[in-house]
A protein has these predicted regions:
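Hydrophobic alpha-helical targeting segments used for export or membrane insertion
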Residues: 5-12
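Signal peptide processing junction and immediate N-terminal pro/mature segment
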Residues: 12-20
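Amphipathic, heptad-repeat alpha-helical segments
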Residues: 21-46
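Charged, low-complexity interaction regions
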Residues: 38-47, 61-69
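Sequence/structural signature of beta-propeller domains
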Residues: 58-64, 72-403
Length: 403
């Protein structure tokens, strides 16, 4: 991979003054290589290379040569950092602007896997983790029938996902449709799965075989029941058995949303208010989403809150190239704030993705992954590709390494 990246940097770098290399020829070469690799991809490394080429092709098509070389440089820097680490050299990885380096040691490049079915993944939960391998559960908010998908993920020493295997889809016994499943957790104490339904603001319990147990979390009456502003996020703390849930947006007329905690026996405990950042976009596109897309309960009792603002100017190909998603990850500490009060939030990192460079990723699912050799923890994000919209969008997996 590293030799491929370095070769690409040389190929795409500005030519000497006495040499002429046309952008169309570079575009043709990159597009041809992309087409070939898309049919030959068999590994996570191949998928990463395809992603880089996609970004380069998009930039060249827009006449942005500097933009074409940028993803190669970034990926090469990551590869060099990884190689240096393996060689015992202390090389600090480059972190996104605004990242708190006291909390984050690395933000890995996103990757996708051709053997994981394209879907509308809106939640992810760990089922069983053994070293750098683990089984995880995914929920799809536009699934034809209610259920969850089981996948197996493999990680390298840097916390990057290097392989994925689809184990299969488990339908629930309810046979429900149109429930807009947004959140999923695995209750390690009971060995059961809980699914959050945004359409009805319900959180129901199921066995790993999909059979409903009849038990449910007693959701708060103040959660709004107005379509996409309903239950969006669900998380579970394996240390104390508490559940956490919140909505994507604020109740009508309100300026804050509520994060609700639940006891291991499913009854509500305290709730805290959370203030969203002001929208970054002054003009909303034809498709616009703004709010909390996921929360993640940490072993120390804190919560990670993922704020997501997606703005798509229009549905035509030309308009869609201006699509942008801005994600900001915050940390809050309910234990240090009295219940019923507003949580103070602290920025952990930010992720911006764009359709123009083919990095567009609407991250909706988030959960903890394995613990690495140095004691750091992997945080996994998964995106909603709208079922691989028009063959362009991907179900991206991204990992952030927490200290």
């Amino acid at each position: 991979m590293l030799s491929f990246l370095l070769s690409a940097i040389i190929a795409f770098s500005p030519a000497p003054a006495d040499t002429t290399v046309s952008a169309p020829s570079l575009f043709g070469m990159a597009k041809a290589l992309l087409g070939y690799m898309s049919t030959q991809a068999t590994s996570a490394e191949d998928s990463t290379a395809i992603n880089i080429l996609q970004q380069a092709v998009g930039a060249l098509e827009a006449g942005d040569r500097d933009g074409a070389i940028a993803p190669f440089k970034e990926a090469a820097a990551q590869s060099l950092s990884g190689a240096a680490s393996e060689a015992g050299l202390n090389v600090e990885p480059v972190l996104p602007a605004g990242t708190d380096s006291s909390l984050v040691s690395r933000v890995n490049p996103a990757t996708f896997f051709l053997n994981i079915p394209a879907a509308n993944y809106s939640g992810i939960a760990p089922l069983a983790i053994n070293g750098l391998e683990g089984d995880f559960l995914l929920v799809d908010d536009k699934s034809a029938t209610e259920g969850f998908r089981k996948v197996h993920l493999s990680f390298d020493d840097n916390g990057q996902i290097i392989a994925a295997q689809d184990i299969g889809f488990i339908a629930t016994s309810t046979g429900a449709t149109g429930i807009d499943g947004e959140g999923i957790v695995y209750d390690v104490r009971r060995g059961t799965v809980l699914l959050a339904r945004e359409a009805s603001n319900e959180i129901l319990e199921f066995g790993l075989d999909g059979k409903a147990t009849g038990r449910y979390l007693h959701t708060a009456s103040y959660f709004p029941k107005n379509g996409n502003a309903g239950l969006e996020s669900l998380s579970y703390n394996t240390e104390n058995g508490r559940f956490w849930a919140t909505t994507e947006g604020c109740p009508e007329g309100a300026t804050q949303l509520r994060i609700q905690s639940y006891a291991p026996y499913f009854w509500p405990l305290g709730h805290w208010f959370y203030t969203l950042d002001k929208p970054a976009f002054k003009t909303k596109g034809a498709i616009y989403a703004y709010g909390v897309s996921e929360i993640c309960a940490m072993p120390d009792g804190s919560l990670l809150v993922l704020e997501r603002e997606a703005n798509i100017p229009g549905t035509s190909v030309k308009e869609a190239t201006g699509a942008v998603v801005k994600c900001k990850l915050y940390r809050v500490e309910p234990a240090k704030t009295k219940a019923g009060k507003t949580l103070e939030k602290h920025l952990v990192t930010r992720i911006d993705t764009r359709a123009l460079d083919l990095s567009f990723a609407n991250y909706e699912g988030m959960c903890l992954g394995p613990v690495l050799k140095d004691g750091s923890r992997v945080l996994i994000l998964v995106s909603d590709s709208q079922a691989g919209y028009k063959g362009i969008l991907r179900d991206w997996f991204k990992t952030i390494i927490l200290k």
